[in-house]
Swiss-Prot record:
GO biological process: ribosomal small subunit biogenesis; translation
Name this polypeptide is given: Small ribosomal subunit protein uS4
Every S4 RNA-binding domain range: 96-156
Binding partners and assembly: Part of the 30S ribosomal subunit. Contacts protein S5. The interaction surface between S4 and S5 is involved in control of translational fidelity.
GO cellular component labels: small ribosomal subunit
Protein family per UniProt: Belongs to the universal ribosomal protein uS4 family.
Highest rank taxon of the organism: Bacteria
Role summary: One of the primary rRNA binding proteins, it binds directly to 16S rRNA where it nucleates assembly of the body of the 30S subunit. With S5 and S12 plays an important role in translational accuracy.
Gene3D superfamilies, sorted: Ribosomal Protein S4 Delta 41, Chain A, domain 1, RNA-binding S4 domain
Gene: rpsD
Stored PROSITE patterns: RIBOSOMAL_S4, S4
Protein's UniProt keywords contain Secreted: no
RNA-binding in keyword set: yes
Length: 206
């Protein structure tokens, strides 16, 4: 399945919640009709079956993190192999992706922009260039903007926006140096309460 390149707000309307695919610090406002489905008249959303709810939750999380279906299934398999709660393991793996960490540290306004920075070799991990968005960041890894990329206006603008967002407690960021440390693995309480990972586990457990 190809990566979706259409209007970002349409995806948020389809899921009925802000997926934070657009830059900025404010949630999508009421003019965007987040509670109505995409389309000229915003068709009424049908009541979903259990399977439909599970599928919709998986699609929502997949879109939040910008993951293709095959990648997402592989993350689930890995989460299921690990000790502990499979759903929480899944979210931790997604949060540990380099593109997500770059976004969380404020070097990019969206995860899509973070993926682009990583792919364009603008990010270093422990002093070495890493251009793989799915690279798993480990505790105590230092993630930084590459020296020759620090003058990019979009990175500076993103850091200014990040000052207005809630800062993740599992990361330590030095905005002036454009670098940060992955201090610890995030706990479930650190992450979005709007995600019901149990539905995803139920879907893949069938």
């Amino acid at each position: 399945m190809a990566r979706y390149l259409g209007p970002k707000l349409k995806l948020s309307r389809r899921e009925g919640t802000d997926l934070f695919l657009k830059s900025g610090v404010r949630a999508i406002d009421s003019k965007c009709k987040i509670d109505t489905a995409p389309g000229q008249h915003g068709a009424r959303k049908p009541r979903l079956s259990d399977y439909g709810s599970q599928l919709r939750e998986k699609q929502k999380v997949r879109r939040i993190y910008g993951i293709l279906e095959r990648q997402f299934r592989n993350y689930y398999k890995e989460a299921n192999r690990l000790k502990g709660n499979t759903g929480e393991n899944l979210l931790v793996l997604l949060e540990g992706r380099l593109d997500n960490v770059v976004y969380r540290m404020g070097f990019a306004a969206t995860r899509a922009e973070a993926r682009q920075l990583v792919s364009h070799k603008a990010i270093v991990v422990n002093g070495r260039v890493v251009n793989i968005p799915s690279f798993q960041v480990s505790v105590d890894d230092v993630v930084a903007v590459r020296e020759k990329s620090k003058k990019q206006a979009r990175i500076k603008a993103s850091l200014e926006l990040a000052e207005q967002r809630e800062k993740p407690t599992w990361l330590e960021v030095d905005a002036a140096k454009m670098e940060g440390v992955f201090k610890r693995v995030p706990e479930r309480s650190d992450l979005s309460a709007d995600i019901n990972e149990h539905l995803i586990v139920e879907l893949y457990s069938k």
